[in-house]
Each structure stands twice: as C-alpha cells, then as structure tokens.
Amino acid sequence: MRIVDLYGQGRPIFSFEFFPPKTDAGENKLMETMADLKSAVEPDFVSVTYGAGGSTRDRTHGVVTRIQDELGITGMAHQTCVAASRADVLENVKRLVGSGVENVLALRGDPPETDGDWRPPSDGFSHANELLEFLTAEFDLSLGAACYPEVHPEAISAEDDLAWTRAKVESGAGFLRELLQ
C-alpha cells in the first residue's frame, strides 16, 4: 500500500520506525519482534532508517523487504542523499522498487562532522527537495519528507524552515513526517 493513500482516511495512522540491525541475528530478532507487534497493534506501516555513512546502510533494503514479504506490513525505506551521488541513489532506489518497495522517505541526512562547511558530492544533492525532484522524475513512488515542528536546527528562522518544507512538498513529497530535536 502507498503510504500517501493512508492519509485523508479520517483515522490516526500508526507506524514504527527501526534502524536495521548490524547482524543477521539482530535482523532475525527484529523480525520476531515485528511479528509480535503486528499481532498486538497492527501498524499501518514500518519505516526503516538508512545510515548515510554507517554500517547499517546496506541492510535497509533487506529489512524493509523482509517486513513486507514475510510479515505483510507496508514498508517505507529511508533514502538519504548527504553522501550519495545521483548514481548511488538511482541504483539503491531501483533495487528497492525491484523488490516491491513503493514508499520512500527522502531525507538529506546528517552531514558528517567536519572542520569546515559540509559540501555534497559534485554529482549529488544539497537538500532533500533536490532528492525529491530527482526521485519524482525517475520513479512512481509514494514519497515522504521530514518536517520540523520545533524548527530545523540549521534554519535561519521559523519562516525559513517553513519555506524549505514547502519546497519539499512542491518537489514531490506526498506526506510529511515530523522530526523533533
């Protein structure tokens, strides 16, 4: 099911968010836990994070597809762009789509800590709205983006933050997920 279609049904949407475990044993334990949660609370979907530079990045695909295939729960994969080229993003999302994933949360992600200002790869994306434009042009997906009710920590002002949120919607986000700092 496309997550964007859940909204507007006049009922609360309930979901879980997990990071992919670093080991196969951890992944199997997560699947057992998710099976228990499914029978107890019937989540509408499960969101799986994507570590831009971390060791769990490559496991997002496996976890989200297992949640969908083995448990029958709608999955949403996070896709960050902070350290990714357009080719990297294209390859990863093609793989997700090929496995039946149709929901993606498009995020810039946290830049690595450096002594100077962070700069994206030369063939990458500076902001999530650029990632959303790219994904919208390449795929037919249910795309979400982050919003910050308490204002993004890098925003100049609340108005500036709202302008960035609007840019995400205008670039293809069909729904927003709130992030609190």
Task: Give, region by region, the residue ranges found by the protein language model.
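Acidic-and-aromatic substrate-binding clefts and catalytic sites of carbohydrate-active enzymes
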Residues: A25, A52-D58, V82-A87
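N-terminal active-site wall of soluble small-molecule enzyme domains
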Residues: D58-E70, D88
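Glycine-rich, N-terminal phosphate-binding loop and its surrounding beta-alpha-beta segment
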Residues: I67-V82
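Short catalytic-loop micro-motif centered on adjacent basic/acidic residues
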Residues: S47-V48, G75-Q79, F175-L180
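Flexible loop residues that form catalytic
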Residues: G51, G109, Q181
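Alpha/beta enzyme core
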Residues: I3, Q9-I13, K22-V46, E70, ...
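GNAT-family acyltransferases
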Residues: E17
